[in-house]
């Protein structure tokens, strides 16, 4: 599939992004301003997650699978290449869990021949970057890398699928 070019949106986040799906499914009594404040207050976890996503993107682009022998290499990349203090990694995330998720995600994305970090666009206020995506034979596959303590939410993937349908003019019933 030839995806549209949205390179001008790389490393940007939309207000109405699938990653912050709570705007679309806000529970009654939830204050969105408090939610956004809490998200930004966990800056190291976000920085580490961004670095792990970048490592995953590079691995998928080069089709280089991760294995248990590269765990220390990933830790070294975080501390040396991304200049994240080792203490911040220890306090900010469960590195063993994050590495396990990273390994599964990278290896699965390579196995399914997925494209990493694909921007799906509807408007300047509603776009998001799918961590890994493929669309072949009317089968849409979207994977989302989770490296933190937050729960995985199907709503985020549903919004990515909706953005795909809107951008590429597919009706949901046309997709398996």
Residue ranges and their predicted role:
Residues 44, 48, 55-142, 148-155, ...:
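Catalytic cores of nuclease domains that cleave nucleic-acid phosphodiester backbones
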Residues 1-75, 79:
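Charged, glycine-rich intrinsically disordered N-terminal tails and low-complexity linkers that flank
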């Amino acid at each position: 599939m030839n995806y549209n070019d949205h390179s001008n949106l790389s490393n940007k986040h939309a207000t109405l992004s699938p990653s912050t799906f709570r705007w679309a499914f806000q529970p009654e009594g939830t204050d969105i301003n408090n939610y956004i404040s809490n998200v930004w207050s966990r800056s190291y976890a976000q920085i580490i997650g961004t670095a792990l996503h970048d490592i995953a993107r590079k691995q998928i682009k080069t089709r280089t699978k991760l294995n248990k022998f590269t765990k220390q290499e990933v830790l070294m990349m975080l501390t040396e290449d991304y200049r994240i203090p080792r203490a911040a990694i220890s306090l900010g995330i469960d590195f063993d869990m994050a590495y396990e998720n990273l390994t599964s995600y990278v290896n699965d994305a390579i196995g399914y021949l997925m494209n990493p970090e694909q921007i799906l666009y509807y408007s300047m206020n509603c776009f998001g970057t799918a961590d890994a995506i493929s669309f072949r034979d009317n089968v849409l596959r979207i994977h989302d890398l989770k490296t933190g303590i937050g729960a995985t939410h199907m709503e985020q993937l549903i919004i990515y699928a909706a953005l795909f349908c809107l951008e590429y003019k597919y009706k949901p019933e046309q997709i398996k």
